């Protein structure tokens, strides 16, 4: 079977698709992965680019309403237009038997219909699959149970997607015959790449929604950095990572984390990512190591604690490692995951970004450390998940 995989977003959106691509290829399928231009090219995968620079669209030059509106017009909207067109062009060129796509690939339904092939949508948090049991993960009510009104919150992401309907229609020029199909078929299935240990399946999800657990490589091919390995072996440590987030004062965040960790006698591995964390000179010392990134499967298993932004991928990686957490959400589905981790006993109550301080972290770290036993239990259960295997089983059954 020829599988076209299309994803958009940050590392947490790309790496799971790469894991799916590798596993599907290992089972004899022909797979092509379309991904953002600034994503690391995955080894051993046939890939193409989507004319999308995610870091650029996540980094507006200012935080005033005017600056954000200008950024939306000048960067976000044009980037989405290019991605919509590139997704159509690359999918048509590959001639797939099945299209598997991220919800942000807004032209995927159109191109699948035009080619007469089924499609499957992938969710890393419940945003497109509505439920009366919980609110949409990415909206302003993501951490509040609205009861009977929960289902209405899913209208927000649908309304945002409709803003680009005109761009999707114009991308039909890339289709065979240059015309948009006069219908839109529903997805054949939804792959909810979420662990039931962090989000038990709501009883009103339809049968076509398959909750597979998270997608990750079962064995890392990367070798640990000797400098990082030596640091980790020297005593208890915290892993601090805000991934792709870069909003606000990175040095102030680094200072708060290092100060709070030292209060608890912990050393700190700072992963600077896209610039969301930095270490002020006055905080430097032998108990702190700063690197841009490191494989989570190397640095998390021995950690006493993780401080992170609550992205879906990071939340699953930390919980799967059996490590308690302090979550500082920035945006999107991060407040949802911070609340879920706390609800299931593996993290302290989330600290809103605007309230982050050394004092707040001292208290939260103490709380999180007391949850080690529960984190170990949940991690053991999550490591039984075989997300990519189950996902490919579903694709093969369609």
Regions found by a protein language model. Name each.
Residues 1-11, 15-32, 38-46, 149-162, ...:
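Nucleotide-activated sugar donor-binding and catalytic core shared by glycosyltransferases
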Residues 103, 123, 272, 310-311, ...:
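Nucleotide-sugar donor-binding loop of glycosyltransferases
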């Amino acid at each position: 079977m020829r599988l076209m995989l299309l994803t958009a977003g940050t590392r947490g959106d790309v790496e799971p698709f790469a894991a799916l691509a590798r596993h599907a290829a290992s089972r004899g399928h022909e797979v092509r992965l379309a991904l953002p231009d600034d994503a690391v090219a995955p080894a051993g995968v046939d890939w193409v680019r989507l004319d999308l620079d995610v870091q650029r669209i996540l980094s507006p030059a200012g935080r005033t309403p005017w600056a954000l509106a200008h950024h939306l017009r000048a960067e976000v909207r044009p980037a989405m237009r290019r991605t919509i067109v590139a997704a159509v062009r690359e999918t048509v060129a590959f001639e797939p038997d099945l299209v598997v796509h991220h919800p942000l690939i807004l032209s995927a339904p159109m191109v699948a219909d035009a080619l007469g092939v089924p499609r499957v949508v992938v969710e890393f948090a419940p945003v497109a699959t509505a439920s009366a049991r919980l609110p949409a993960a990415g909206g302003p009510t993501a951490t509040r149970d609205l009861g009977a009104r929960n289902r209405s919150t899913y209208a927000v992401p649908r309304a945002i997607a409709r803003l680009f309907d005109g761009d999707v229609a114009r991308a039909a020029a890339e289709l065979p015959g240059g015309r948009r199909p006069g219908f839109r078929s529903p997805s054949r299935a939804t792959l909810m790449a979420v662990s039931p240990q962090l989000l038990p399946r709501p009883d009103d999800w339809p049968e076509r929604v398959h909750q597979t657990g998270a997608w990750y490589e079962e064995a890392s091919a990367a070798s640990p950095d000797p400098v990082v390995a030596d640091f980790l072996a020297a005593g208890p440590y915290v892993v601090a990572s805000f991934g792709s987030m870069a909003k606000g004062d990175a040095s102030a965040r680094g200072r708060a984390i290092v100060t709070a960790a030292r209060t608890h006698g912990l050393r700190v591995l700072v992963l600077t990512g896209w610039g969301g964390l930095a270490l002020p000179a006055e905080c430097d010392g032998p108990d702190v190591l700063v690197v841009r990134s490191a494989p989570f499967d190397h640095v998390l298993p021995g950690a006493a604690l993780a401080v992170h932004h609550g992205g879906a991928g990071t939340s699953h990686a930390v919980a799967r490692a059996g490590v308690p957490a302090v979550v500082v959400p920035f945006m999107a589905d991060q407040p949802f995951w911070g609340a879920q981790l706390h609800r299931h006993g593996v993290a302290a109550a989330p600290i809103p970004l605007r309230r982050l301080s050394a004092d707040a972290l001292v208290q939260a770290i103490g709380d999180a450390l007391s949850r080690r036993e529960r984190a170990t239990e949940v991690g053991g259960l999550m490591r039984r998940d075989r997300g990519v295997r189950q996902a490919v089983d579903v694709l093969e059954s369609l």
